[in-house]
Amino acid sequence: MPEPLPTAEVDRVLVVVAHPDDADFGAAGTTATWTRAGVEVTYLLCTYGDQGGFDDTPREQVPAIREAEQRAAAAAVGVSDVRFLTGYHDGSLDPTRELQRDIVRVMRQVRPRRVLTQSPERWWDRIGASHPDHLAAGEATIRALYPAARNPFAYPELLTDEGLEPWTVEEAWLMADERADHAVDITDTFDAKLAALRAHASQTAHLGDDLEERLHSWGRKVAEDAGMAPGRLAEVFRVIATG
């Protein structure tokens, strides 16, 4: 596997996901380690998660609820720049050229060295991780990252009309990928991850105290599989050099 860029050399990271809470389930502990090290992290949500939830809240109220929850969750891990795309809907996300263009726009605005997103590859043994929207967000992000973001002739209106210069992202990190091989120790940031996920009350309140145990169990298993010392907690990613 490629050796990831040292955190000390990464000034900005862009996280692109399909729904509110996706980044927090998959990478909140890692994100907190980055922000505590001085890395500027931006969240980009492709939808407002309007199909999520476990109660009878009117659907038209859900986007505002989930946006507020995501902003609170982001704050728990040190992220203040949270952006939402408009015009895309939970349950019907596709890696269209329009979605790719909108992600390229943010890549050129933020100019990150690293992008973290969802794996575009279906994981048959963990089908729950392969929600179609997750696959679409990951596919659109990878297409945006290479080659469009660095190509001045891709979406030329971004350069001519908006003045957004091409940008080369050097590294992609994929969540929920079957071939993930880079574990990050999140023992010291687990409480931040838990706080972030509790902030998504419309999605997690029904779990009660079981939420902490589930997260702890997942993190412990990942750490054990990565050969970390007993009692450690981790998140795992597939890292791809894209520079």
Language model segments and positions:
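Active-site rim/loop-helix segments in enzyme catalytic domains that contact anionic ligands
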Residues: 1-111, 238
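Metal-dependent de-N-acetylase/amidase catalytic core
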Residues: 1-14, 95-243
